[in-house]
C-alpha cells in the first residue's frame, strides 16, 4: 500500500519537527512533484500570498511562515468545502485546531485584492491560472484545482469570522 499521510500528519508537518520525516518520505516517492508531492502544497498557495503581503510593509504586524500557512490551510479547507464537498464538520475542526495553535490575524477587506494579486505570482501557477491542492476528505485530495476570485474572497471572510 502506498504511503498517503492523513490530514493530521499533513497538519503536523506544518507545525512540528515531524514534518521533515513526512516530507522526505513524500519527496522520495514523488521527486519531481508529479502527484503525491503536491499534497505538501495544501495551505501554501494562499499562505505564501498572505506571507508576501505581510512582508511587503513594515507597518503590518509580524507574521511567521507558520502563521501564514495556517491561514492558508483554513482558507483552502473552506475552498475544499465549497468546491469538493469537504465535510463542514472537518472544515470547522481545521479552523479550531489552527486557531488553538496560532492567534488569529485579521485579514482586512481592503487588503483582499492585494493578496489575490500576489496569488497570481505563485510558482505552481500554470498559464496564469492559480492551482490549489484541495481536499475531498482528510486522506483524499484533488490536485491543480481552479478557484474563482469570488470564492477566494469568501474564504478570507470565513477565516475572519
Describe the residue ranges of each PLM region.
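A glycine/threonine-rich phosphate-anchoring loop and its flanking beta-alpha core
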Residues: 1
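Active-site segments that bind and position negatively charged phosphate/pyrophosphate groups
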Residues: 4-113
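C-terminal charged capping/lid subdomain of soluble metabolic enzymes
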Residues: 86-161
Amino acid at each position: 500500500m502506498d504511503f498517503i499521510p492523513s490530514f493530521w500528519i499533513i497538519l503536523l508537518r506544518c507545525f512540528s519537527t515531524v514534518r521533515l520525516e513526512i516530507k522526505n518520505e513524500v519527496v522520495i516517492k514523488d521527486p519531481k512533484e508529479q502527484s503525491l508531492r503536491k499534497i505538501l502544497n495544501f495551505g501554501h498557495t494562499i499562505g505564501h500570498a498572505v506571507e508576501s503581503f505581510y512582508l511587503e510593509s513594515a507597518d503590518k504586524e509580524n507574521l511567521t511562515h507558520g502563521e501564514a500557512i495556517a491561514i492558508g490551510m483554513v482558507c483552502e479547507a473552506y475552498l475544499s468545502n465549497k468546491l469538493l464537498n469537504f465535510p463542514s464538520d472537518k472544515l470547522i475542526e481545521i479552523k479550531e485546531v489552527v486557531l488553538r495553535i496560532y492567534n488569529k490575524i485579521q485579514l482586512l477587506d481592503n487588503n483582499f485584492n492585494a493578496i489575490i494579486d500576489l496569488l497570481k505570482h505563485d510558482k505552481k501557477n500554470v498559464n496564469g491560472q492559480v492551482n490549489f491542492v484541495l481536499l475531498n476528505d482528510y486522506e483524499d485530495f484533488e490536485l491543480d484545482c481552479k478557484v474563482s476570485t469570488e470564492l477566494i474572497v469568501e474564504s478570507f471572510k470565513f477565516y475572519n469570522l
